């Protein structure tokens, strides 16, 4: 894959169940207050370390607030060598509306 794909929350959940890595690019405080279980918070401070330790061929699902910022982040991650990248349309807000029991705090 040379470009990322935009996917709905249902497809993101299916990928998550198959072992995909979920990264959340919202701000740290918002991430702490509510996020998808087992997702990784990714920001300018953590991205280099994340990339260095990541399996570039493992599916990577990017989520933000509403599905806009995640597209830029997904494109960047493709440029860094990730081969299977997805951006969640509707972001965390649509995820939370679709899967209200699939969020955690802290």
UniProtKB/Swiss-Prot annotation:
Active site: 64
Domain of life assignment: Bacteria
Location relative to the cell: Cytoplasm
PROSITE patterns named among the record's database cross-references: RHODANESE_3
Function: Transferase that catalyzes the transfer of sulfur from thiosulfate to thiophilic acceptors such as cyanide or dithiols. May function in a CysM-independent thiosulfate assimilation pathway by catalyzing the conversion of thiosulfate to sulfite, which can then be used for L-cysteine biosynthesis.
Chief subcellular location: cytoplasm
EC number: 2.8.1.1
Reactions this protein catalyses: thiosulfate + hydrogen cyanide = thiocyanate + sulfite + 2 H(+); thiosulfate + [thioredoxin]-dithiol = [thioredoxin]-disulfide + hydrogen sulfide + sulfite + 2 H(+)
Signal peptide residue numbers: none
Domain Rhodanese stretches: 16-104
Pfam families: Rhodanese
GO terms assigned for molecular function: thiosulfate-cyanide sulfurtransferase activity
Protein name listed in UniProt: Thiosulfate sulfurtransferase GlpE
């Amino acid at each position: 894959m040379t470009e990322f794909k935009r996917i709905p929350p249902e497809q993101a959940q299916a990928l998550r169940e198959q072992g995909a890595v979920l990264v959340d690019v919202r701000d740290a405080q918002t991430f702490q207050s509510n996020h998808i279980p087992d997702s990784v918070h990714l920001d300018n401070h953590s991205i280099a370390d994340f990339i260095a330790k990541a399996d570039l061929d493992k599916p990577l699902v990017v989520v933000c607030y509403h599905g806009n910022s995640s597209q830029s982040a997904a494109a960047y991650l493709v440029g860094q060598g990730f081969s299977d990248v997805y951006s969640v349309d509707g972001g965390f807000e649509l995820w939370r509306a679709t899967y209200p029991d699939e969020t955690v705090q802290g």
